[in-house]
């Protein structure tokens, strides 16, 4: 039977000093011997998705202590990708994922904590905590801060739903008046919570549900809704049960690696494809799988992308539906229920509730359950009141959205498309693959061939797009923006947004070894691997080269001969794989990150082989 990790610091005469320090934190005589559970919070006033988390750690802590544990809270950093976007700050976003994972490991191992509750929400925080959880493999439950309410405003006598991306597009569109742009800006982000569409933050919080590491509603229940408080309360209670199951009953099914198995990762990826989630989730799932030694890679994602239909269409792929609408339609459980009925779910995988997915669907799927309590839970809706307070309202929709033919969530037979919402493309320009969010691509450009317009940085691309260098029919290539080449693999939301504002959203393609915001739509292909800085063929493209994209056949190719490609490679080897004439200040911290970063097909994790020998 495993021994409590915390006993290392709480038992024996030689630990008198450690016990003295524990006592100084409030631990009493009768507490020694109880499990020490880390409450890993990520409160910050910099990020709307985290601004309301300050008191929620102590809410969880109270429940842990009432259930017989010792709760100790600490915080991680949290970068707001939207605020860091479009300037040098974005270089720090992806590297912060590794920093978060490491800091959780440092705190938990330094103090010998027995288990964790991870309070996350936004883009790199959930993935960083997930990586740490799989690395440490101690009992864990995730509970996120929840999504923001969708913005709403009246334009042309019609109420429309808004989000951050709408504010960016309107702000860059010269045809939009200053007054309208300001109106959109003031309405786009009305409450605390992660941005209201199926962007990276909400995608990842949904995926923790599918992995089995969080409770029903975690990914979709609004941050402002009173019902969300129960998720935090229940997390505190449940983590003590899981902890005692493992340490006192030798039940290894309570450990994250035995919950988030390969089957669970396939469930999460199936959900991601079905809901047209952010392409960033591919990076993060691959990274988490590596941390947990789960055999899950791009080959699995490619296979699944050909099998799973697109069942749920949400902003930024449509303005009609946001996360509040996904919740009304049954949330993550609703989507997984449709995948199960289509034979596309591993329904014997287990969750932190101790149930198989088959059992959990029977209890929480609005299409199966008779429980009025569950149905009321999924009717939790927005209040439309600006606030930074969690649990501040208890509004409910009059009805659920159980229309599986034309509603927010659909059956396989009524899918938005039988082809899923994400696809892996391969070809001579991306031998190890690249990713496109097909949910956001107009059907008219699923096949696209055009001349390359090459930029060595995101900044140059923005200047080129706004300066008229890019024309209808072009393929914009932005390179040396990968994990190593950036460094930090910036998001290309501004280039894609400006293509839309210039009327080119359906007239151009964009290819990059960087990545995209979850708010991106259009023919935007990212994660080209190997990246340019690692000798990838994207570094060999020249202005005017034809690039052929064929999403239905999962291919992308540079239309030049193999001989020409080989000759260019010889020349580039001599020059070195570096961006030409790019002036960018890179700090020591970012250089250290770049020195070990792998390309996107490996999850942009650190290359452990560099530590061997």
Swiss-Prot record:
GO cellular component: cytosol
The keyword Metal-binding belongs to this UniProt entry's keyword annotation: yes
Its job: Functions in the biosynthesis of branched-chain amino acids. Catalyzes the dehydration of (2R,3R)-2,3-dihydroxy-3-methylpentanoate (2,3-dihydroxy-3-methylvalerate) into 2-oxo-3-methylpentanoate (2-oxo-3-methylvalerate) and of (2R)-2,3-dihydroxy-3-methylbutanoate (2,3-dihydroxyisovalerate) into 2-oxo-3-methylbutanoate (2-oxoisovalerate), the penultimate precursor to L-isoleucine and L-valine, respectively.
Gene label: ilvD
Keywords, sorted A to Z: 2Fe-2S, Amino-acid biosynthesis, Branched-chain amino acid biosynthesis, Iron, Iron-sulfur, Lyase, Magnesium, Metal-binding
Homology family: Belongs to the IlvD/Edd family.
EC number: 4.2.1.9
Lineage of the organism: Bacteria, Pseudomonadati, Pseudomonadota, Gammaproteobacteria, Vibrionales
EC class of the enzyme, as a word: lyase
Active-site residue numbers: 517
Residues that, per the record, bind [2Fe-2S] cluster: 122, 195
Top-level taxon of origin: Bacteria
SUPFAM superfamilies, per the entry: IlvD/EDD N-terminal domain-like, LeuD/IlvD-like
Name the UniProt record assigns to this protein: Dihydroxy-acid dehydratase
InterPro entries from the UniProt entry: Dihydro-acid_dehy_C, DihydroxyA_deHydtase, DiOHA_6PGluconate_deHydtase_CS, ILV_EDD_C, ILV_EDD_N, IlvD/EDD_N
Record flagged with keyword Plastid: no
Quaternary structure and partners: Homodimer.
Record: residues binding Mg(2+): 81, 123-124, 491
Note accompanying the cofactor annotation: Binds 1 [2Fe-2S] cluster per subunit. This cluster acts as a Lewis acid cofactor.
GO molecular function terms listed in the Swiss-Prot or TrEMBL record: 2 iron, 2 sulfur cluster binding; dihydroxy-acid dehydratase activity; magnesium ion binding
């Amino acid at each position: 039977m495993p021994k409590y990790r915390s006993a290392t610091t709480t038992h024996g005469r030689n630990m008198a000093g450690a016990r003295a320090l524990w006592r100084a934190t409030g631990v009493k005589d009768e507490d020694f011997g109880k499990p020490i559970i880390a409450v890993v919070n990520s409160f910050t006033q910099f990020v709307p998705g985290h601004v309301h988390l300050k008191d929620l750690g102590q809410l969880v802590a109270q429940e842990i202590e009432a259930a017989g544990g010792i709760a100790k809270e600490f915080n991680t950093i949290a970068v707001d990708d939207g605020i860091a976007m479009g300037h040098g700050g974005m270089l720090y976003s992806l590297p912060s994922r590794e920093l978060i994972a490491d800091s959780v490991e440092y705190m938990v191992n330094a103090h010998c904590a027995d288990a964790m509750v991870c309070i996350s929400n936004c883009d790199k925080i959930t993935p960083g905590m997930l990586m740490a959880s799989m690395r440490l493999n101690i009992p864990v439950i995730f509970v996120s801060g929840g999504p923001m309410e969708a913005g709403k405003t009246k334009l042309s006598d019609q109420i429309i739903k808004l989000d951050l991306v709408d504010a960016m597009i309107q702000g860059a569109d010269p045809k939009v008046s200053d007054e309208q742009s300001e109106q959109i800006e003031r309405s786009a982000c009305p409450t605390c919570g992660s941005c209201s569409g199926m962007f990276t933050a909400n995608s990842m919080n949904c995926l923790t549900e599918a992995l089995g590491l969080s409770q029903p509603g975690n990914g979709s229940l609004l941050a402002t809704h009173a019902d969300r408080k129960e998720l935090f309360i229940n997390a505190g209670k449940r983590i003590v049960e899981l902890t005692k199951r493992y340490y006192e009953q030798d039940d290894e099914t309570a450990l994250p690696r035995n919950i988030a198995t390969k089957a669970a990762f396939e469930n999460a990826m199936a959900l991601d494809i079905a809901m047209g989630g952010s392409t960033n989730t591919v990076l993060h799932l691959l990274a988490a799988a590596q941390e947990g030694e789960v055999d899950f890679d791009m080959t699995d994602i490619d296979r699944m992308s050909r099998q799973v239909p697109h069942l749920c269409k949400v902003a930024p792929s449509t303005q009609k539906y946001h996360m509040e609408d996904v919740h009304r339609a049954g949330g993550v459980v609703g989507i997984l229920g449709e995948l199960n009925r289509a034979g596309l779910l591993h329904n014997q995988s287990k969750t932190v509730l101790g149930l198989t997915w088959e059992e959990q669907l029977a209890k929480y799927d609005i299409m199966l359950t008779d429980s009025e309590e569950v149905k009321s839970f999924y009717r939790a809706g927005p209040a439309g009141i600006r606030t930074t307070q969690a649990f501040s309202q208890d509004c409910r929709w009059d009805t659920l959205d159980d229309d599986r033919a034309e509603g927010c969530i659909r059956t396989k037979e009524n899918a938005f498309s039988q082809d899923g919402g994400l696809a892996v493309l391969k070809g001579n320009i991306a031998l190890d693959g690249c990713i496109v969010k097909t949910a956001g691509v107009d059907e008219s450009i699923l096949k696209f061939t055009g001349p390359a317009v090459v930029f060595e940085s995101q900044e140059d691309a923005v200047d080129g797009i706004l300066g008229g260098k890019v024309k209808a029919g072009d393929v914009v290539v932005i390179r040396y923006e990968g994990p190593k080449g950036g460094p930090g693999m910036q998001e290309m939301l501004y280039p894609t947004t400006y293509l839309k504002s210039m009327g080119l959203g359906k007239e151009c393609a964009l290819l990059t070894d960087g990545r995209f915001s979850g708010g991106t739509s259009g023919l935007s292909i990212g994660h080209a691997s190997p990246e340019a800085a690692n000798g990838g063929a994207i570094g060999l493209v020249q202005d005017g080269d034809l690039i052929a994209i064929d999403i239905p056949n999962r291919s992308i190719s540079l239309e030049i001969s193999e001989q020409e490609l080989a000759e260019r490679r010889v020349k580039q080897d001599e020059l070195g794989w570096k961006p030409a004439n790019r002036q960018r200040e890179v700090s020591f911290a970012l250089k250290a990150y770049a020195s070990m970063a792998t390309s996107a097909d490996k999850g942009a994790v650190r290359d452990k082989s560099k530590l061997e020998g």
